[in-house]
């Protein structure tokens, strides 16, 4: 590919010694990758001590990059233009002790991948060198807004296809420079009036689709998975041949903006920043912690890129003659200085960026959620074809690993149960609610809204949960709320859904789009699963009560009579659901006890014997299991009120196993009852010769098979029939059994823990000490123009490129999951001792009471006939 930026290109350097993980079908784009297997070239990045000739060592990079020609005899000695080599005499120069030189020194901050401290050191202007750079004067916008353009590395510039690079709009720098803005204001004040702007608006482009990715602390694999999935979906839209919309009024890619909002510097994974730097959206050493003493609230980077990194650390670049090349994507990267929660991230998205870009549709994604092929286009089409559609969501399914619907993660019963939950929700719940026009929850991990539909009261109510507005809102803010309302905002997406449908004078409705799919990671361990469901259960319960209490606001909306009729039906359905959920604890216990009593103590009016251990042993075993059930139910309250899940991991795992075993026993008993109903005389004594009325009476009698058939059809048949009608039945064979076994735990463990920790709303912000390492921006009066300017380091292109080499190495290095420390804290040990003491005290006294008050001589409450 011809280049107008000499010196540095992304050249292919294949190597046979390079290890490449097994390709995954969703990420494998071999035609674009910079890696080919049949070549003898040696990587120019590898350390001399880790080359194949060194015993016991092996290069594990999935991609090799070069910024010089493909001559394997050359080593990556960084060269500079003469005017930058040693501008201040022989005592100054590059301190090159990185791989590729004869004697590598200790790793310096530019190369280290596993050190947050290394990232801190890289934030200093001119890091990695002791040279003195020239400076340039940057004028502040309206005297207060710091916005600077920085040249991107030559390799990134050269990766842009010529047809885009040569079609610049009036000197546009979107492919050659990254724009950095230090936002020192609240999101509500990020306006054109205050001097803030964004590139798509500066280029007078209409934004049809704003794709937002919210991030907290996900690793680079999860982030790359989401971002690459978005890039592939943008390609699907750009490649549309017969579109009535996208191919008119300018290129399709100019109507799409991708916005990444990172919730704080402190929790952010610094390796993820290297991935963003590799595609040009971020650079080390440019952020300012304050401007003239006014603290920076958010660091905003803008760049239009054609590069992407896959989940297995493979860099994808475009090819000129390939229709499957990724098109340009307009990127906005907002890195908040402090951790201020997801609602605040959405305030930056909607109130700051949304008001400037004014998009038609906003799609929300969580980092780690990968949209499927053409999924984003399917969501957008739903809005395009329905002018009254205010919000929509697609199908979210659990990530099961290699093997697709038969992935190896299904071996974990917790993952399998969650997979079944997701599938049944997408088959039964979401379509039903969509037919009514009100989907109670559009998951924040994968949903879309029409921007003008949520403007006004829906967003105002939604942002009451932002703790950064607590002082401004007073009693209406998060600090003035009672504990019920605070829990309500743990399920903030439900609040937005209700406010959107109930918006006064409007007739917006919500929908489920089956054609749009996305996959997401689910918790694989008991402690993580319990912690996640605490927030979900408490938030959804509070939000459900809120929507029922404020249903009268629907009468102020613009919905027609038919829609209002179905909304009333849905209200009744929601009331029943809340009641069933409220009494589910007793329901499971009663079901377990009644089934055990029916089978273990059969009526004397028939000849049936106790099943499965006979008339003597079965009642004893049933009583033991019932006492164990109640004992572990009580234990859940003790654990939930005094311990955190990670500190009581073993106790929770044992609880999951015990409730699963009891549920398995109950399922066996229920199957026995079904067989007995159809095989015994009393069970099949149906009147068939005295008319339809007598037939129905005998069929649905207490001893008839009708009740059993209805129970089976409602429990098992509905799931099977609906799954086959949706042409997606595989979860019934891979996950249904695990779900049945874990169903009691979902109630007895998760709900007890959630309600017992109703007080935990977790609104506090974490520290942000990482911002302390950032330099400040101090303005000076320009002698000529008398305006406020900031002196900024002006790095030569050669130095930018040399530092980019190390960035690519860090970004494409194989991901090493951090080792989770299982050591319990001192506080955990104290709480565990307290739990064991209280449990031993309660259960020993209960055992004594049962033994003494038992009517029979069997001191454990057994009643043997």
UniProtKB/Swiss-Prot annotation:
Transmembrane segments: 565-585, 620-640, 650-670, 707-727, 735-755, 837-857
GO CC terms: cell septum; plasma membrane
Temperature-related activity annotation: Optimum temperature is 25 degrees Celsius to 50 degrees Celsius.
Localization of this protein: Cell membrane
Membrane-protein topology: Multi-pass membrane protein
EC code(s) of this entry: 2.4.1.16
InterPro entries, per database record: Chitin_synth, Chitin_synth_fun, Chitin_synth_N, Nucleotide-diphossugar_trans
Reaction(s) this enzyme catalyzes, per UniProt: [(1->4)-N-acetyl-beta-D-glucosaminyl](n) + UDP-N-acetyl-alpha-D-glucosamine = [(1->4)-N-acetyl-beta-D-glucosaminyl](n+1) + UDP + H(+)
Domain of life: Eukaryota
Swiss-Prot/TrEMBL GO biological process terms: cell wall organization; chitin biosynthetic process
GO molecular function: chitin synthase activity
Protein's recorded name: Chitin synthase 3
């Amino acid at each position: 590919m011809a280049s107008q930026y000499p010196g540095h290109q992304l050249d292919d350097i294949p190597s046979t010694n390079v290890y490449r993980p097994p390709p995954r079908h969703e990420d494998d784009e071999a035609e674009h990758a910079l890696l080919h297997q049949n070549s003898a070239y040696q990587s120019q990045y590898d350390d001399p001590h880790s080359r194949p000739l060194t015993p016991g060592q092996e290069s594990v990079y999935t991609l090799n990059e070069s910024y010089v020609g493909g001559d394997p005899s050359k080593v990556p000695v960084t060269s500079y233009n003469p005017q930058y080599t040693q501008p201040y005499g022989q005592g100054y120069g590059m301190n090159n002790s990185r791989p590729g030189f004869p004697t590598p020194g200790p790793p310096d901050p530019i190369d280290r991948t596993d050190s947050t401290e290394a990232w801190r050191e890289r934030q200093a202007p001119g890091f990695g060198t002791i040279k003195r750079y020239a400076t340039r004067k940057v004028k502040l916008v309206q005297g207060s807004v710091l916005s600077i353009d920085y040249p991107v590395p030559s390799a990134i510039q050269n990766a842009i296809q010529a047809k885009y690079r040569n079609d610049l709009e009036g000197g546009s720098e979107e492919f050659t420079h990254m724009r950095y803005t230090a936002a020192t204001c609240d999101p509500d004040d990020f306006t054109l009036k205050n001097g803030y702007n964004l590139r798509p608006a500066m280029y007078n482009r209409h934004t049809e689709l704003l794709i937002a990715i919210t991030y907290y602390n996900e690793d680079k694999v999860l982030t790359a998975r989401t971002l690459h999935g978005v890039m592939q979906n943008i390609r699907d839209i750009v490649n549309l041949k017969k579109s009535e919309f996208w191919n008119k009024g300018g290129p399709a890619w100019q109507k799409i903006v991708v916005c990444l909002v990172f919730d704080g510097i402190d929790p952010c994974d610094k390796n993820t920043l290297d991935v963003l730097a590799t595609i040009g959206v971020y650079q080390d050493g440019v952020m300012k912690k304050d401007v003239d003493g006014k603290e920076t609230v958010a660091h905003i980077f803008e760049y239009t890129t054609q590069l992407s990194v896959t989940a297995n650390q493979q860099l994808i670049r475009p090819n000129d003659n390939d229709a499957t090349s990724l098109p340009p994507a307009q990127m906005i990267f907002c890195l908040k200085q402090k951790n201020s929660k997801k609602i605040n991230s959405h305030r930056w998205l909607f109130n700051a960026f949304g008001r400037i870009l004014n998009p038609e549709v906003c799609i929300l994604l969580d980092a780690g959620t990968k949209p499927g092929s053409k999924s984003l286009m399917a969501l957008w089409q739903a809005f395009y074809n329905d002018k009254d559609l205010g919000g929509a969501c697609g199908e979210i399914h659990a990530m099961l690993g290699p093997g697709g619907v038969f992935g190896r993660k299904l071996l974990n019963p917790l993952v399998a149960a969650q997979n079944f939950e997701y599938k049944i929700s997408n088959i039964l719940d979401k379509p039903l609610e969509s037919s009514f026009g009100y989907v109670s929850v559009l998951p924040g991990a994968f949903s879309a809204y029409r921007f003008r539909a949520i403007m006004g009261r829906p967003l105002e109510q939604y942002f009451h949960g932002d703790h950064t507005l607590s002082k401004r809102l007073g009693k209406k803010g998060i600090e003035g709320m009672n504990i019920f309302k605070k829990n309500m905002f743990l399920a903030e997406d439900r609040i937005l859904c209700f406010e959107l449908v109930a918006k006064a004078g409007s007739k917006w409705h919500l929908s489920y789009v089956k054609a749009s799919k996305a996959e997401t990671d689910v918790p694989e361990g008991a402690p993580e699963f319990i912690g996640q469901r605490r927030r979900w259960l408490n938030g959804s319960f509070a939000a459900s009560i809120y929507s029922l209490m404020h249903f009268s606001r629907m009468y102020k909306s613009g919905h027609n009579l038919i829609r209002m009729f179905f909304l009333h039906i849905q209200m009744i359905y929601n009331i029943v659901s809340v009641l069933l959920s409220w009494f589910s604890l007793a329901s499971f216990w009663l079901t377990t006890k009644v089934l055990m009593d029916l089978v273990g103590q059969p009526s004397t009016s028939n000849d049936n014997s106790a099943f499965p251990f006979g008339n003597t042993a079965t009642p004893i075993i049933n009583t033991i299991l019932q006492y164990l059930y109640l004992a572990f139910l009580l234990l859940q309250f003790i654990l939930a009120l005094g311990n955190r899940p990670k500190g009581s991991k073993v106790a929770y795992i044992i609880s999951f196993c015990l409730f699963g075993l009891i549920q398995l026993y109950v399922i066996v008993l229920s199957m026995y009852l079904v067989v007995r109903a159809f095989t015994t005389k009393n069970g099949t004594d149906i009147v068939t010769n005295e008319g339809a009325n007598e037939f129905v009476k005998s069929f649905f009698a207490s001893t008839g098979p009708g009740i059993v058939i209805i129970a089976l059809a409602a429990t098992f048949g509905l799931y099977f029939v609906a799954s086959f009608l949706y042409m997606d039945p595989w979860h019934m064979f891979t996950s249904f059994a695990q779900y049945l076994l874990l169903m009691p735990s979902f109630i007895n463990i998760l709900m007890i823990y959630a309600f017992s920790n109703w007080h935990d709303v977790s609104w506090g912000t974490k520290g942000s000490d990482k911002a302390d390492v950032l330099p400040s921006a101090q303005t000076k009066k320009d002698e000529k123009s008398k305006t406020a300017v900031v002196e900024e380091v002006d790095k030569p292109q050669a130095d930018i490129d040399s530092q980019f080499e190390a960035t690519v190495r860090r970004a494409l290095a194989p991901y090493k999951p951090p080792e989770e420390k299982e050591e319990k804290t001192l506080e955990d040990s104290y709480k565990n001792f307290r739990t064991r003491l209280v449990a031993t005290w309660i259960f020993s006294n209960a055992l004594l009471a049962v033994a003494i008050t038992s009517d029979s001589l069997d001191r454990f409450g057994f009643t043997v006939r």
